Amino acid sequence: MIFVYALLALVITFVLVPVLIPTLKRMKFGQSIREEGPQSHMKKTGTPTMGGLTFLLSIVITSLVAIIFVDQANPIILLLFVTIGFGLIGFIDDYIIVVKKNNQGLTSKQKFLAQIGIAIIFFVLSNVFHLVNFSTSIHIPFTNVAIPLSFAYVIFIVFWQVGFSNAVNLTDGLDGLATALSIIGFTMYAIMSFVLGETAIGIFCIIMLFALLGFLPYNINPAKVFMGDTGSLALGGIFATISIMLNQELSLIFIGLVFVIETLSVMLQVASFKLTGKRIFKMSPIHHHFELIGWSEWKVVTVFWAVGLISGLIGLWIGVH
């Protein structure tokens, strides 16, 4: 059945994207490009966004099929809740930007409050209503040490889900970058899940992986469609949730290393400018810095993919030992 889920997720996305692109163009749901960014990005202006709807719909449909046939499907139900929750936040943000022509979208406060709400509901469903059972301790790799947090673990969940949701969102600035890194990440977590005996989570990772494989041909340079916040916020939230449910939280630092680096580059840039009035990078997130020093977009993307693959393998090794 795993092959069926994979094929279904792949086909649904691959078929939906070319159907959605003309609709998005007709409705003028196009991406706005920052004027201070690399000049090579100006040609991307108007490229349809909100393409994440396609793979999210594929994930929802395929997961609902899987829930029918998979024993102990509660992990899939919970992951589906997180997918829809963070995806809905991203969709509303995209809608305000492209339909209401308000480049700010949701305010930072509105977005954070909504993300925190999803994270708290996830904790309640899992640890209060026991939809799934996972430890409320953070396990230190290569040791038998676990830091017990009990109900304070909800604070960690909020930090982890909100942090990685926004980290993937920051990374989604170059054609195919966030999509391919996510494919690498879900491949690692699929393997890890099956090795650890978490079959339902592994099946969900396979669904994620193949839904994104169906999207990648349309998102790779030159991109015909962008995933938008609809897709990126959901992907980051799912990554964090999977690492939590596997009790392998810290593996995500390596599996999602590029997302972490991109986020740190923004934080360092803002802190440096506020404290000294000077910028560390020509532009943040850091992928734009490399473009502005002369790297082609394709070079930046392929180097970041390579980093993601190597660090992902390290994260997998950490997770299964």
PLM regions with names:
Residues 1-23, 55-88, 122, 126-127, ...:
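Alpha-helical transmembrane segments
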Residues 19-37:
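Membrane-interface helix-loop junction between the first two transmembrane segments
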Residues 28-34, 90, 94, 130-138, ...:
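Peri-membrane helix termini and adjoining interfacial loops of integral membrane proteins
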Residues 34-48, 101-115, 286-288, 292:
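Juxtamembrane helix-capping/reentrant segments at transmembrane boundaries
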Residues 45-47, 140-152, 294:
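Short aromatic-rich membrane-water interface segments that cap or initiate transmembrane helices
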Residues 71, 99, 130-145:
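Membrane-interface helix termini and inter-helical loops of multi-pass transporters
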Residues 72, 76-107, 111-113:
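Hydrophobic alpha-helical hairpins/lids featuring a short glycine-rich hinge
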